Curated annotation (Swiss-Prot):
Predominant subcellular localization, coarse grouping: cytoplasm
Binding residues for ATP: 197-200, 291-294, 333
Chain segments carrying region Allosteric regulation domain: 395-573
One GO process term, biological-process aspect: hydrogen sulfide biosynthetic process
Name of the protein in question: Sulfate adenylyltransferase
Upper classification of the organism: Eukaryota, Fungi, Dikarya, Ascomycota, Pezizomycotina
Gene for this chain: MET3
Swiss-Prot/TrEMBL keywords: Allosteric enzyme, Amino-acid biosynthesis, ATP-binding, Cysteine biosynthesis, Cytoplasm, Methionine biosynthesis, Nucleotide-binding, Nucleotidyltransferase, Transferase
UniProt-annotated binding residues for sulfate: 197, 199, 295
Locations listed in the record: Cytoplasm
Molecular function as annotated in GO: adenylylsulfate kinase activity; ATP binding; sulfate adenylyltransferase (ATP) activity
Site residues by UniProt (Transition state stabilizer): 203, 206
EC number per UniProt: 2.7.7.4
Function: Catalyzes the first intracellular reaction of sulfate assimilation, forming adenosine-5'-phosphosulfate (APS) from inorganic sulfate and ATP. Plays an important role in sulfate activation as a component of the biosynthesis pathway of sulfur-containing amino acids.
Length: 573
């Protein structure tokens, strides 16, 4: 028998409401509808399938306050993370929502109706209290930033009725609901299951750790990685799942199973560890591995950890009896080359030689294409990582040139395009300011808002090309720092971004203007012209600065090439 669910009953709303499917689906079409965000979708999926048992909906004010203040629902059940549905006053008023109303919850991706919520209450949360009590209050914490920057001012509480399952098109066979996983364990005859939570690729140390934990408890292993929302910058779940699938045959035959969890992590450390334990209990696990700094977001800008290294272990241990799942606390394993084995650090005598590779070092080796030893990770795992993380010489990048009209941006961009094409190895795309204006932004004017929109269009195109491995050269005027920073953020999510300030002076650009556009602007024939009646904000932190008044185009291109070589994007001559 699998572990009983949290609260005693698995709240599988999909199964409960299946007999009323046609009735609920018809009603959902007649109700006002809320479009759910990606986080809402993750939360709703685990509400509907029972992963968040004993919840049957989004928390009302009593449950919310109980969880924030006392780590408990209003009925006394332990629960550590607020599961809330936020909405703006404008949306609430526009849909006419009030206590007692029924509202359809709709998937923003395909407009499918997923559930009907009967509203208990609509309330304004104390976000400051939520940030402090649940996450520790540090304004740099990703969940605190999300709370303040992306969460609407009102929460809507109430129970939901299931209309449809969420559609997934990836790894469908690995997306077990709690009921399905429990049935799977029963079919396999498993009665003791150690669950392992991860949002990272797994290597040999993780395999050793989970096998040790299972053998010590005469149990089997559930590898239960998160494939919903994790920490920004994490390796994508497609790569990670391929890693887990490659690793699975390295376990003793029949010991481990892989299941995917569509969870939106909050990176909430101690509170999140309790939540993770509840979720794994609902999925049938009897044991749960909690490691060092479990579900922590790393360090803040001062280099300080948001939580203590063992705060999460202590939190789960505190509520061990109520949780009804055994906590497996583990020490970090390290490799002993003399005996070719992994051991917990606290069991290694002083003076014994050890080896380890940090996450930073691993990323460096992947970036440079250098050797990753088999003692650290299995060849089949490394192969997957290399396919998804090619060395920089095979990665895309964007060189973004900014400067006045006639500063030399276009000449540098064209010359750089020719130089990169000569080098070969990747496609090269050129996004000149005039070309983009004609092809992508013909309807835009030159107001600050339209200029910003134009730069964001360039950034979107550049990001997609960069993601596909191209070298992108963009050369708009881009006069505003805010627009350039947003372009950097957009493109950096897909690859590496280099900002080149073409710092040719306004006087020189105007003096050498053969097209006469500056003269026309001075006469008032062109309005909103950068440098004449519209400002150019000097870049604060360019990656490189060139000046055609003081150097040749060839020299400027050479500086950019040297920068690309130094960062590993081009092979050194």
């Amino acid at each position: 028998m699998a572990n009983p669910p949290h609260g005693g009953i698995l709240k599988d709303l999909l199964a409960r409401d299946a007999p009323r499917h046609a009735e609920l689906e018809a009603e959902a079409e007649t109700l006002p509808a809320l479009l759910l965000t990606e986080r809402h979708l993750c939360d709703l999926e685990l509400i509907l399938n029972g992963g968040f048992s004993p919840l049957e909906g989004f928390m009302n004010e009593k449950d919310y306050n109980g969880v924030v203040e006392n780590v408990r629902l209003a009925d006394g059940n332990l629960f550590s993370i607020p599961i809330t549905l936020d909405a703006s006053k404008e949306t609430i008023d526009g849909l006419g929502l009030q206590p007692g109303s029924r509202v359809t919850l709709r998937d923003f991706r395909d407009d499918r109706n997923l559930a009907i919520l009967t509203i208990d209450d609509i309330y304004q949360p104390d976000k400051q209290k939520e940030a402090k009590e649940v996450f520790g209050g540090d304004p740099e914490h990703p969940a605190v930033k999300y709370l303040y920057d992306q969460t609407n001012e009102y929460y809507i509480g109430g129970k939901v009725e299931a209309v449809n399952k969420l559609n997934h098109y990836d790894y469908v066979g690995l997306r077990f609901t709690p009921a399905e996983l429990r049935l799977h364990f029963d079919k396999l005859g498993w009665t003791r299951v150690v669950a392992f939570q991860t949002r990272n690729p797994m290597h040999r140390a993780h395999r050793e750790l989970t096998v040790r934990a299972a053998r010590a408890r005469q149990a089997n292993v559930l590898i239960h990685p998160v494939v919903g929302l994790t920490k920004p910058g994490d390796i994508d779940h497609f790569t990670r799942v391929r890693v887990y699938e490659a690793l699975l045959p390295r376990y003793p035959n029949g010991m481990a199973v892989l299941g995917l969890l569509p969870l939106a992590m909050r990176m909430g450390g101690p509170r999140e560890a309790i939540w993770h334990a509840i979720i794994r209990k609902n999925h049938g696990a009897t044991h749960f591995i909690v490691g060092r700094d479990h579900a922590g977001p790393g360090k803040n800008s001062k280099g300080e950890e948001f939580y203590g290294p063992y705060d999460a272990q202590h939190a789960v241990e505190k509520y061990r009896h109520e949780l009804g799942i055994e906590v497996v606390e583990f020490q970090q394993l390290t490799y002993l080359p003399d005996t070719d084995e992994y051991k917990p650090r606290d069991e290694i005598p002083a003076g014994v030689k050890t080896l380890d590779i940090s996450g930073t070092e691993l990323r460096k080796r992947l970036r440079l294409g250098t050797h990753i030893p088999e003692w650290f990770s299995y060849p089949e795992v490394v192969k997957v990582l290399r396919e998804s993380n090619p060395p920089r010489s095979k990665q895309g990048f964007t060189v973004f040139l900014t400067g006045y009209q006639n500063s030399g941006k276009a000449a540098i961009a064209r010359a750089l395009q020719v130089t990169l094409n000569q080098q070969g190895g990747r496609s090269v795309s050129l996004l000149l300011g005039d070309t983009v204006r004609h092809e992508l932004s013909a309807e835009l004017g030159f107001s600050r808002e339209d200029r910003h929109k134009n730069i964001q269009r360039i950034a979107f195109v550049a990001a997609e090309l960069t993601k596909a491995g191209a070298a992108v050269i963009a050369a708009p005027i881009a006069p505003y720092e805010e627009s350039r920073q947003q372009a950097r953020e957009t493109i950096s999510s897909a690859g590496t971004f280099f900002l080149v300030h073409v710092a040719t002076s306004l006087e020189y650009a105007e003096k050498t203007d053969k097209r006469g556009v500056y003269a026309r602007a001075r006469r008032g024939e062109i309005k909103g012209f950068t440098g004449v009646d519209d400002p150019y904000e000097t870049p604060q932190k360019p990656d490189i600065t060139v000046d055609i008044e003081k150097q040749t185009v060839r020299s400027a291109v050479h500086e950019i090439i040297l920068l690309l070589e130094s960062q590993g994007f081009l092979e050194k001559a």
